[in-house]
Each structure stands twice: as structure tokens, then as C-alpha cells.
């Protein structure tokens, strides 16, 4: 054990040179960056992501090729609203996507048409926040990565009912038709196109250019050619024919419709294949006029190729033309118009780049599998691919090759956010290109521009439906930072193009040896999704092809390379057959193994080998697990099933009022908080200039160069979130942990709160636990709690709920927010402001008015009395009804915030006033931009002083500052810096870098000013942006403080969960001999059968840590041993294993046996009794059965089911039973009569017929049975 204190923790890790964890959100952030490639200049962009989609869809031309629309570049402008604004107003955080398009005419007749270059708005793109989320309609969402079958070729095997082994090869492309080659029980090989159309493989070979039998047999080297003459033929008597002997002739006939003479080639089979040549065949062969015949080779081939001969026997075609026609008829069930169209259909299937795409991955996998050297740019199938696949399949039949394991991670790849968005954009752009083509054709003779051709809604509708409805776009789990980060690193096999729960078998769900270091074997949901949803391991990365890689250290001749160069990231395929040592294998300082036998891993085997045989070594013992599993101390002592529950339950831990980091951690807690980005962190080195509860200001250090190229001040302000609601109605309430004048370093965490303490993850509380039964109250995992825990708010959490009310214009008039509500007492509206919204600080009880609203009633003819009153008083107060938002039956809390958003509805005079304001805003913007440009020009003059231009060009490549000329202020004044190439302006590299940064910073600042201008104009002309049809929206936020109580669920980190059964007074709890009462009593019987001994290790080490004031880090599979525990309990003056005598709180007597008393980290989970408790007296009924609805959400009742009826029957309680089944449930008439009887105090009426019986009768009548009750 090393006694070094990392982050004030004693670390037990034995591994030397541990690898730094990668950024945990890299999988999401990098994918989105690669999708947009915003930091890459247009000319250097890779053909991937959005750029690839544009490149594939452009240029677009009309049908006559007169007009061409070309794509030059795309860019984005700053968002109109901040992320916080979007969350508050229910908007989508998006950026405008714009493309530079060029429209030109190729037709010389259109002389009046000039080439047009325009920036065209293509719609808003939801933009990923720095926390790797998307804000869609005010809610934070995550796009989960999908694990799906990699494109490529897969060889499989199945067994027919009669025991015959059948083999198949399936080619899966990114885009295009699937093709499968498969054998049948008659040893014939067929090709299946799109799993439907079946044809002999030789027919396909003919169609792709191997026209006759000779060509096909030569591929497999199966036949020899014999020249036809008597001498040669006599020599081959007794041998088998490999190909048919065909007589070919041309036949002419007259087409009746056209009168033309048409020639057709005819074939006649003289002798069939597989015929043994007899002497009498010689003359027939010579008479047929063939030049050569094919016969079987005498020496047998290494493999059995009889399947090819069998397939040829089944082949109905004799030439390429016949094969093409046959395939066309199979696919289309019709005859082709001509030979060319038939051939085109086959080419389009597999050889057309527009219709078929293997993708980089598919080509890579096919080349790898079949040992081909085809260029990676060839993304369609080739003849060579098809031949090699057939050859491999024949080897498979001859047991000379192996079938693929489809659960091997080399056959599964990850579709990350960027790829999923690219696919959606491809769909949107393909639709848009169709409409562009149509519009070009319609506007043939007009002068038009790119803007006239494009409809921006096309793309945004596809993108919006993806984020709103796709199974992989999910509402973010925001219970605590761990839940957030785990959700973003999740891998799902479900979703479009993936598996479905029902079809997924055991093999797909099971742990595979290739998951090691890539997908966590522990963290997966319990239930129907088990094994289909996994989590990425801590060190895993996803490469450009979408395969998951994990790091290893190279080992050469028994010596581990501990340098940076010795680190390699390998995919499952590259790791295949390598011998890999474990991460905790003891090493000498020079990297050699201490022991002469090393435990290692090779595929699914675990050999013990000599150090010289080892090829690689794990980088760390925790490499195998995900973040959540890595947070469980002593995981190595827990059963896997319980560890699974533990890692899942930590994600449900509710943020507490005061967070407390665990005494026994694993060392990953700090990294998790840093990478979750839920706290405020310093962006660089600097000094705290100002700090209070809501704001932190930092003055950052900047070099002279950074200062020179920047247009921003070095002082940056951060707002600290206070009582912000999360997706799960938890609270983000942060507090600063820094003081004015403190020096901060880059990445330093400056706040705490929201399950974080001192920069470390803090999900629960360290509590003193006794493992002993207590009066039966901890039977079956129940938990006994000390009242102190409740009183001192140790496990108290704050929950914030948002309630909103919308004001719309109805058919009968405008709704209105007001505190003046008809027929409501003054007492009920005392807390409402003039807009009818409850005041901040008001205590809410069930039934209280939160937001007052009146809505117009339907006009009905007034009675004479009403007419008289209206004539006298002239009021129309009776025309509105109360439509206020009231607190639900279980709602109690305090109003902590309120908001009102209004769309501006203006009269003529205020519109005129606004019109006068707009020019002022424009002038203000112009003056700010002029000042900004003045500063830019001044700085550019300094940078270019004495230097000569290397030629400055605009984005079209036209020179705007001539090569060889000197730079002048007038040159710079006339430049449009937003449309300029930033390549080398001078021959000084340093100056060029400075110029580039300066102009980029200028463009960024300019776009910010432009966005601010648009925002101001929008606020004046339209007001708050609200969803369609809504005029006002009021929101109130209610905070509820929840103490822990009986019925709440708690858990440790080892899957040891339970429900609080009793909160006991402090003086009645068992206490230690020094008088300390324990906080919590757990049942010791919950440990042995569950096999999660890790909790005992944790309790023992935790108590030693608490007594000594020390915190520990015990990494998984490399943590503290029993000897370490004993050493620390001895230091703390505690008995071994913390077996301590306790005294009974009631009598003060000592218990007979010592019990384990330790300090365990306990979590309060999101399953709280307050959310689940529910009672109904009257409420809604189901429309059809007329029975009460079920569930708390519907304000439903409990179902009195079949078994409960038996119970009442057993007691003979016939009247109660009759009541329950009729008037208390679905006897509609009886219900209302019973109500009348109760009100009037009369005896109960006789029950009628239950509605469910009527439903049954209607059902039977619907089946045509006439049933009447008598």
C-alpha cells in the first residue's frame, strides 16, 4: 500500500503509473464536434458528418441540366437565447445553419441569368451544450449511442430439421439491398436478394460477367478445356462433362406490331452436364459445331466443390443475357422493356454508388475478412468480393474455415450522436433536393436565386421529429451527477435499426470476452432490457470506424513499456489471440515482471504463462468496469448480481441538503465531478475578483499575445445556480467554495452542492451502522433509523416542482390572468399578485390557488332577471368562469420563484412607438461594429507593419489585397472580414497565427453583437418567444423539504437495499459502550445469502477512518486487503473486524454477543413514500367499464380483484360484497341513487346491474349471440 494522500485520501492502489482517465463525456462531445467540424477551415474538412451529407447531395441540377446549384460552405450563427433562457421558456437551444450556395446556368440561351452566390438559411440545428445534452422544448435530452451490427460480411451456420448443417454468408451494407448466400439440404447454393428473391448462385455469377459454364468453373479451377476433334474426344471417353454441350443458332422472325425483322439467339442442349462421355457421343459433339468442351479435372481438388456442379444443374440460364432476364423477372415479376434496363437494375442493386454503400466500415470488414486489398474508396461490391465470399463459404462447408461470432465486438459497432444526426440530415437533404429539382423545373424561364429554391422547414421537421420521437433521444436522467454522466455514456442495442426486446435472445444479452475493457459486465438494467443496454468502461474510446477500443501497455520480451509510447488502443479484432497480463501483476521499477509465472488472458481463456510470452498488459485493474461500478469500494468482494444493483441504485440517490463525501471511496469521485460539468470550474489560471452566493468573477491570467488578439475583457463572471429544478424535480443548489483573492488553476472546481462536496461526488451520508436484529423491525431487509438522522436533516432532500398555466385566445374571447376570480373568497386570493400569480415565500397547502385565471363562458340566453340586473348594473361578470391552477391533494411546500412570459399584443400607437425605437437599436449596433472594426484594423496594422502581402483572397478565391503590395489601413477598411480566407497573409508564421486568431475573435464578437441585435428587435416586436397559440405563460416553482421517514427506500453501495420500517428515539437505539447510539440498524441475515461482503469491509475501514479523521481511496480490484484493514483498525484503537459489544437502549444492558459496528455510506433513493401514498374517495371513472381508474396519476382507486372477492366469500360477507361490486364500483344508476339516499338520509336502494356485465353482453352480441337478461 502506498501511503501517499491523493486529494487528502489514503490510496491503497498498488499499480504503478496509473493511466489518466479520459474525459468521460468525450464520446458525446467529440462525436458532435466531428459532425459539425466548425473549428476546421472549409478546405481542410474531412468528408464526414454534415460536410459529407452536403457533398453527397450537391450539386443539384434540373432535368435538362440547364441550372446547377452548387454547395460551397456551411456555417452557423450564435444562438438567439442562452441555455437557461431556453429551459425557462420551453424553447429549443439551437443555432441557425446557413449554407453558401452558388447557382449558375449552363444554357447559353439564358443570357440574362447571372451566377448567384447566396447565404441561405437551412433551418435551426439543436446544438449540444458543453454538458453533452440538447435542450429540446425546454427539457434537457441525451442522444444515446447505439450498438448495432457492423456493415460487412458475416458467415453463419444453422441446422436443418433433418440434421443437415446449412451455411450462409450475409453482406450487410450501410445503404442498399442485403444479399445472402446460403446452402440448402440438397447441397445447392442460392443467393437471396433482400431476403426475398431466391436464385442459384451461378445465375448471379453469369449476370455479373461470368457468362458461360467455362468462366464459372475456371473461377474455382474445376475443369479442363478439350478442343473438339475425334482424337481428343476418344481420349476423354469415360470422363464426365463439366458443362453442357450447346448448339447455338440465330432465328429471325417478323415483329407483327412494327413489321421489323428481329434476330434472336437460340440455344439447344445437345448433351447435359455430368454426363459420362460415351463413344456414341463423339459424333453428336462434332455435329453441334462447338469448338471446345469442358470436362472434370482428373485429380480431385483439395476441397469438395460438388456444390458448384449441383448449383449449375439447378441453373436455368445458359448465358449472361438469360441470367440477367431471369434475375429481372425474379425481382420485378415482369419482363423488362429491353436488355439495357434489365442490366441497369442489377447494376443498381450492388454496383451503383448512388444506391449501394458499404461505408468505410463495410469495406474495411470485407477486406479484413477475405484478405482483399481493394481500395478503401471502393464503397460498392466488386466481382472479386462475390467470388471470394463464395469460395469462403465452400471452405466453410469443407470445415476449413470458421463461422463468425455475431456477439464478438468486432462485429458490432457504435452509432454515436454525430452519425445519428448525419443520417437524419441525409434524409432531410434528400427530401430538400427533390423539392429544389421540382422548383428548378417549374421556374425554367424565370430569373431566380438559391433562396427561392429552398424551404428551410424540410430539414428542421426531420431533425425535430428525431429529437422528439426517436427511441435513442431520451429525457436526461438528472437525479445526480452520476446519473447524468452514465446516461451520456450508455450504449443501447435497441432503437431503429437495432434489436427489439422480444427478439433478443440470451446470447446477445450475455457478457462476451470482447467486452473486457469496453463494455461493463456489471452495469446493465434489471428486467426486460438486461444486457441490451450497457455502459462504456472507464478507459474505453470509440474510434473513427465506430468500434470500441481499450488501452493496453506493450510488453516486449517480458518487459512492460511504461512510457507514453508504450500505450496502444486496440479494438476487439486487433486484440484477438493476444496474451494479456492483468493490470495488477507486480512489476519491478524497470517494468519487468516480479514473478516468473504471470496470470494472463487470451480470448476467453486464462492461461498462466512465462513473462516472455506476454504481449500486452492491462493499464489498470479497474479497466473492466464502468464509472458506476468503479465507485463501489471492495467491489471484488461482492457478488456480481448485487454489484449490478449497487451501481444502478447509486444513480437513483437523491441530492441531500448537505452533501458529504464518503470516507471510503475509490478515487474516481473527483474525476467524475470534473467531467460531469455540473459544477463551476475555472477555465484557466487566475484570481478570484469577487464572490457571493450567486456570482463568481475571475480575472484570468493572459499572455501579451492572448491579450492582443482578444476582444473580450480578462474578467469573466459566472452565475451560481440556486434551487434550480432538474428533469427529475431534484434541486441544483450550489455554494461557492472559494474566497476573494484566491488563486485558481485551470479546471479547479469552485462550487459544491448537488451531490458534490469539496470537488468529490457525495451521493449519501456516512452513518454509524450496527449489524444486528432489532425487535424484528429489520426483518426482510427493513431498516431501523435513529431519530437523530431525521432531526438533524442528515437525509433530508429538497424537491422543486414546476407548475405552469397558459393563457390562450379562445373562440369565446381572451383568457386572463387575474386575482379577481368570481365566487372565490378574499382569504383564498390573499397571496396572489395583480397578475394572479402566488407570491414568492407563500406556504402552499392542498387546494390553494397557485395561478388565478378566468376564461370566458359560453354565451347562453340570459333569463329576464339577468337582463334586468345587467340593464341596471351593466356588468358582465357572470360571463367568466374560474380556470385557476390549484394545488393538488398531496402538494405542500413553499413558493421559491415565479415567472411570467408574455407575447406582446400591441395597438397602433405602441406599434408606431416601436417603429421609432428600431432605428435607434440599429444605429447603436452599427456604432458598436464600427468601434470593433476600428480596433481590429488598428491591431492588424501593428501585426502587418513592414510586411508584404502574400495575397489575401476572399472565399471565392478573388484577390482583395494584391500579392507583393504593402498593407494599408484603407485596404483593411474596405474588407469584409466575415468572408475572407485566413490562409497565410504574410511570410511570418507567428504573425499569420496572430492574424488568424484576431480575425476569428472579431467574427465571433461580431456574430454575438448581431445575435444581440436580433434578440432586442424580437423582444420589441414580438415579446417573449412562446409556443404557438399561447399569449401568456405563468410559472411557479414550489420547493418541498422531505425528511426521511418510514416507507422511504435506502441503500448502500453494494446492492444492500431496504425500506425504513421504524424511526426510533435516540435513547432507545442500541449504543456503544462509550454511550454513542448507532444511526442505523441493519439485519445481518441480509449479508451471507446475498454474498456482498464488500459492505462489511467498507463498514470496518469506514469506522477506522471516522475515528482517525482520515479518508480512503480503495480502487476496485486493487484496494485494501484484510491486512490493511487490520492495520488501520489497530491504529484507530478498534477491535479487529469492529466486532463491538452494544447495549440495549431500553434497558441499558449489554447484549450477549458482539455485533459488527462500522461506518457505511448510505444513500436515500428516489423512491419516496410521499410520492407513492395515495387515497381516493370519489374520482374519475373509465368510460367503457364505468369502473374507477387505476394509479396515482389518474387519481384512481385500488382494484378489488378476484382473490379479494374470494376472501369476502370465505367470510360470507354477502352485503359488503354486493356493495363493493355494484354501487361502489360500476353500477351507474345505483351510484347516483346511493348518493341521493346518503344526502337525504334515506335507506340504501337495491343495487342495479354492473356496467361490466353490460360490456360483456355487448361483446357477445357483437359475436352474433342474442342474449337477454330475464
UniProtKB/Swiss-Prot annotation:
Cross-referenced InterPro entries: DNA-dir_RNA_pol_bsu_ext_1_sf, DNA-dir_RNA_pol_bsu_external_1, DNA-dir_RNA_pol_su2, DNA-dir_RNAP_su2_dom, DNA-dir_RNAP_su2_hyb_sf, RNA_pol_bsu_bac, RNA_pol_bsu_CS, RNA_pol_bsu_protrusion
Native source organism of the sequence: Bacteroides fragilis (strain ATCC 25285 / DSM 2151 / CCUG 4856 / JCM 11019 / LMG 10263 / NCTC 9343 / Onslow / VPI 2553 / EN-2)
Keywords: DNA-directed RNA polymerase, Nucleotidyltransferase, Transcription, Transferase
GO biological process: DNA-templated transcription
Coiled-coil features, chain-numbered ranges: none
Protein family membership: Belongs to the RNA polymerase beta chain family.
Name of the molecule in the record: DNA-directed RNA polymerase subunit beta
HAMAP family named in the record: RNApol_bact_RpoB
Annotated catalysed reactions: RNA(n) + a ribonucleoside 5'-triphosphate = RNA(n+1) + diphosphate
Superkingdom: Bacteria
Pfam families xref list: RNA_pol_Rpb2_1 (PF04563), RNA_pol_Rpb2_2 (PF04561), RNA_pol_Rpb2_3 (PF04565), RNA_pol_Rpb2_45 (PF10385), RNA_pol_Rpb2_6 (PF00562), RNA_pol_Rpb2_7 (PF04560)
Record's subunit section: The RNAP catalytic core consists of 2 alpha, 1 beta, 1 beta' and 1 omega subunit. When a sigma factor is associated with the core the holoenzyme is formed, which can initiate transcription.
Any one GO CC term of the record: DNA-directed RNA polymerase complex
GO terms for MF: DNA binding; DNA-directed RNA polymerase activity; ribonucleoside binding
Enzyme class of the recorded protein, top EC level: transferase
NCBIfam families for the chain: PRK00405.1, rpoB
EC number: 2.7.7.6
Role description: DNA-dependent RNA polymerase catalyzes the transcription of DNA into RNA using the four ribonucleoside triphosphates as substrates.
Amino acid at each position: 500500500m502506498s501511503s501517499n494522500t491523493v486529494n487528502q485520501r489514503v490510496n491503497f492502489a498498488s499499480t504503478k503509473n496509473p493511466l489518466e482517465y479520459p474525459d468521460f463525456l468525450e464520446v458525446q462531445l467529440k462525436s458532435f464536434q466531428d459532425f459539425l467540424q466548425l473549428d476546421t477551415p472549409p478546405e481542410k474538412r474531412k468528408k464526414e458528418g454534415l460536410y459529407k451529407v452536403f457533398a453527397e447531395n450537391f450539386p443539384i441540377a434540373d432535368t435538362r441540366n440547364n441550372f446547377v446549384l452548387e454547395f460551397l460552405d456551411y456555417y452557423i450563427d450564435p444562438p438567439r437565447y442562452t441555455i437557461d433562457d431556453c429551459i425557462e421558456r420551453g424553447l429549443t437551444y439551437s443555432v441557425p445553419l446557413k449554407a453558401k450556395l452558388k447557382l449558375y446556368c449552363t444554357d447559353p440561351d439564358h443570357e440574362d441569368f447571372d451566377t448567384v452566390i447566396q447565404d441561405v438559411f437551412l433551418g435551426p440545428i439543436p446544438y449540444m451544450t458543453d454538458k453533452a445534452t440538447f435542450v429540446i422544448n425546454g427539457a434537457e435530452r441525451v442522444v444515446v449511442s447505439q450498438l448495432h451490427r457492423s456493415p460487412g460480411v458475416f458467415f453463419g451456420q444453422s441446422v436443418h430439421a433433418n440434421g443437415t448443417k446449412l451455411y450462409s454468408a450475409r453482406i450487410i451494407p450501410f445503404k442498399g439491398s442485403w444479399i445472402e448466400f446460403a446452402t440448402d439440404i440438397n447441397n445447392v447454393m442460392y443467393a437471396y436478394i433482400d431476403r426475398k428473391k431466391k436464385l442459384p448462385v451461378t445465375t448471379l455469377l453469369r449476370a455479373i460477367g461470368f457468362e458461360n459454364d467455362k468462366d464459372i468453373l475456371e473461377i474455382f479451377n474445376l475443369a479442363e478445356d478439350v478442343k473438339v476433334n475425334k482424337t481428343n474426344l476418344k481420349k476423354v471417353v469415360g470422363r464426365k462433362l463439366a458443362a453442357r454441350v450447346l448448339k447455338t443458332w440465330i432465328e429471325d422472325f417478323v415483329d407483327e406490331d412494327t413489321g421489323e425483322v428481329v434476330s434472336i439467339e437460340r440455344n439447344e442442349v445437345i448433351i447435359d452436364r455430368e454426363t459420362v462421355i460415351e463413344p456414341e457421343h463423339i459424333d453428336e459433339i462434332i455435329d453441334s459445331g462447338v469448338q471446345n468442351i469442358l470436362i472434370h479435372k482428373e485429380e480431385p481438388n483439395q476441397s469438395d466443390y460438388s456444390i458448384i456442379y449441383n448449383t449449375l444443374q439447378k441453373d436455368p440460364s445458359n448465358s449472361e443475357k438469360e441470367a440477367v432476364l431471369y434475375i429481372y423477372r425474379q425481382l420485378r415479376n415482369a419482363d423488362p422493356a429491353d436488355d439495357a434496363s434489365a442490366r441497369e437494375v442489377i447494376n443498381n442493386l450492388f454496383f451503383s454508388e448512388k444506391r449501394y454503400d458499404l461505408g468505410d466500415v463495410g469495406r474495411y470488414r470485407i477486406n479484413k475478412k477475405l484478405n482483399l486489398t481493394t481500395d478503401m474508396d471502393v464503397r460498392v461490391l466488386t466481382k472479386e468480393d462475390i467470388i471470394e465470399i463464395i469460395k469462403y463459404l465452400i471452405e466453410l462447408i469443407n470445415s476449413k474455415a470458421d463461422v463468425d461470432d455475431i456477439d464478438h465486438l468486432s462485429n458490432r459497432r457504435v452509432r454515436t450522436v454525430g452519425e445519428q444526426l448525419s443520417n437524419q440530415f441525409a434524409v432531410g437533404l434528400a427530401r430538400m433536393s427533390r423539392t429544389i429539382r421540382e422548383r428548378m423545373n417549374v421556374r425554367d424561364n424565370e430569373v431566380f436565386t438559391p433562396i427561392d429554391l429552398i424551404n428551410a422547414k424540410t430539414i428542421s421537421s426531420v431533425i425535430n421529429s428525431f429529437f422528439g420521437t426517436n427511441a435513442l433521444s431520451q429525457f436526461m436522467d438528472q437525479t445526480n451527477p452520476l446519473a447524468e454522466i452514465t446516461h451520456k455514456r450508455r450504449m443501447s442495442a435497441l432503437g431503429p435499426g437495432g434489436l427489439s426486446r422480444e427478439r433478443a435472445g440470451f446470447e446477445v444479452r450475455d457478457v462476451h470476452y470482447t467486452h473486457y475493457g469496453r463494455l461493463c459486465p456489471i452495469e446493465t438494467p434489471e428486467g426486460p432490457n438486461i444486457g441490451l443496454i450497457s455502459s462504456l468502461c472507464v478507459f474505453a474510446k470509440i474510434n473513427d470506424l465506430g468500434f470500441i477500443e481499450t488501452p493496453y501497455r506493450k510488453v516486449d520480451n517480458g518487459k512492460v513499456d511504461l512510457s507514453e509510447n508504450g500505450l496502444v488502443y486496440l479494438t476487439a479484432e486487433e486484440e484477438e489471440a493476444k496474451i494479456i497480463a492483468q493490470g495488477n501483476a507486480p512489476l519491478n521499477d524497470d517494468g519487468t515482471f516480479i514473478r516468473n509465472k504471470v496470470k494472463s488472458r487470451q480470448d476467453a481463456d486464462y492461461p498462466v504463462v512465462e513473462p516472455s510470452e506476454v504481449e500486452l498488459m492491462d493499464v489498470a485493474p479497474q479497466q473492466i468496469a464502468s464509472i458506476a461500478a468503479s465507485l463501489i469500494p471492495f467491489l471484488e468482494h461482492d457478488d456480481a448480481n448485487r454489484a449490478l444493483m449497487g451501481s444502478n441504485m447509486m444513480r437513483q440517490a437523491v441530492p441531500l441538503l448537505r452533501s458529504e463525501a464518503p470516507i471510503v471511496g475509490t478515487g474516481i469521485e473527483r474525476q467524475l465531478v470534473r467531467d460531469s460539468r455540473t459544477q463551476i470550474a475555472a477555465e484557466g489560471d487566475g484570481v478570484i475578483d469577487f464572490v457571493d452566493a450567486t456570482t463568481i468573477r475571475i480575472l484570468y491570467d493572459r499572455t501579451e499575445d492572448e491579450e492582443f488578439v482578444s476582444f473580450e475583457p480578462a474578467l469573466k463572471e459566472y452565475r451560481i445556480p440556486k434551487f434550480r429544478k432538474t428533469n427529475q424535480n431534484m434541486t441544483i443548489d450550489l455554494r461557492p467554495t472559494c474566497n476573494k483573492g484566491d488563486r485558481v488553476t485551470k479546471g479547479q472546481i469552485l462550487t459544491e452542492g448537488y451531490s458534490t462536496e469539496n470537488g468529490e461526488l457525495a451521493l449519501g451520508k456516512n452513518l454509524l451502522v450496527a449489524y444486528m436484529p432489532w425487535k424484528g423491525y429489520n426483518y426482510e431487509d427493513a431498516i431501523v433509523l435513529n431519530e437523530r438522522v431525521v432531526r438533524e436533516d442528515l437525509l433530508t432532500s429538497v424537491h422543486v416542482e414546476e407548475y405552469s398555466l397558459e393563457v390562450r385566445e379562445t373562440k369565446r374571447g381572451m383568457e386572463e390572468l387575474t386575482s379577481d376570480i368570481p365566487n372565490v373568497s378574499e382569504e383564498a386570493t390573499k397571496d396572489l399578485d395583480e397578475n394572479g400569480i402566488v407570491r414568492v415565500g407563500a406556504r402552499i397547502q392542498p387546494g390553494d390557488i397557485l395561478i388565478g385565471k378566468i376564461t370566458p363562458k359560453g354565451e347562453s340566453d340570459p333569463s329576464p332577471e339577468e337582463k334586468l340586473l345587467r340593464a341596471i348594473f351593466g356588468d358582465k361578470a357572470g360571463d367568466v368562469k374560474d380556470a385557476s391552477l390549484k394545488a393538488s391533494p398531496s402538494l405542500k411546500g413553499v413558493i421559491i420563484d415565479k415567472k411570467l412570459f408574455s407575447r406582446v399584443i400591441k395597438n397602433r400607437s405602441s406599434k408606431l412607438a416601436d417603429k421609432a425605437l428600431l432605428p435607434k437599436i440599429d444605429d447603436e449596433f452599427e456604432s458598436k461594429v464600427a468601434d470593433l472594426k476600428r480596433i481590429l484594423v488598428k491591431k492588424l496594422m501593428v501585426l502587418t507593419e513592414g510586411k508584404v502581402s502574400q495575397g489575401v483572397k476572399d472565399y471565392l478565391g478573388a484577390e482583395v489585397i494584391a500579392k507583393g503590395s504593402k498593407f494599408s489601413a484603407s485596404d483593411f477598411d474596405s474588407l469584409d472580414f466575415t468572408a475572407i480566407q485566413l490562409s497565410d497573409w504574410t511570410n511570418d508564421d507567428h504573425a499569420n497565427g496572430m492574424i488568424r486568431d484576431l480575425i476569428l475573435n472579431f467574427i465571433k464578437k461580431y456574430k454575438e453583437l448581431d445575435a444581440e441585435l436580433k434578440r432586442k428587435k424580437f423582444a420589441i416586436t414580438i415579446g417573449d418567444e412562446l409556443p404557438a397559440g399561447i399569449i401568456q405563460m405563468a410559472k411557479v416553482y414550489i420547493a418541498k423539504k422531505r425528511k426521511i421517514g418510514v416507507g422511504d427506500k435506502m441503500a448502500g453501495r453494494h446492492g444492500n437495499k431496504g425500506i425504513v420500517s421504524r424511526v426510533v428515539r435516540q435513547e432507545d437505539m442500541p449504543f456503544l459502550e462509550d454511550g454513542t447510539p448507532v444511526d442505523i440498524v441493519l439485519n445481518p441475515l441480509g449479508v451471507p445469502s446475498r454474498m456482498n461482503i464488500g459492505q462489511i469491509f467498507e463498514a470496518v475501514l469506514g469506522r477506522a477512518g471516522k475515528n482517525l479523521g482520515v479518508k480512503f481511496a480503495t480502487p476496485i480490484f486493487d484496494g485494501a486487503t484484510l491486512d490493511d484493514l487490520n492495520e488501520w483498525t489497530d491504529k484507530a484503537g478498534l477491535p479487529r473486524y469492529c466486532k463491538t459489544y452494544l447495549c440495549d437502549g431500553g434497558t441499558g444492558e449489554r447484549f450477549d454477543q458482539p455485533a459488527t459496528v462500522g461506518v457505511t455510506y448510505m444513500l436515500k433513493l428516489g423512491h419516496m413514500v410521499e410520492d407513492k401514498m395515495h387515497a381516493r374517495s370519489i374520482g374519475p371513472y373509465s368510460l367503457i367499464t364505468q369502473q374507477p381508474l387505476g394509479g396515482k396519476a389518474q387519481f384512481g382507486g385500488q382494484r378489488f380483484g378476484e382473490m379479494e372477492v374470494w376472501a369476502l366469500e370465505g367470510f360470507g360477507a354477502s352485503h359488503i360484497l354486493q356493495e363493493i361490486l355494484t354501487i361502489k364500483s360500476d353500477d351507474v344508476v345505483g351510484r347516483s341513487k346511493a348518493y341521493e339516499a346518503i344526502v337525504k338520509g334515506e335507506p340504501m336502494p337495491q343495487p342495479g346491474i354492473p356496467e361490466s356485465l353490460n360490456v360483456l353482453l355487448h361483446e357477445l352480441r357483437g359475436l352474433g349471440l342474442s342474449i337477454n337478461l330475464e
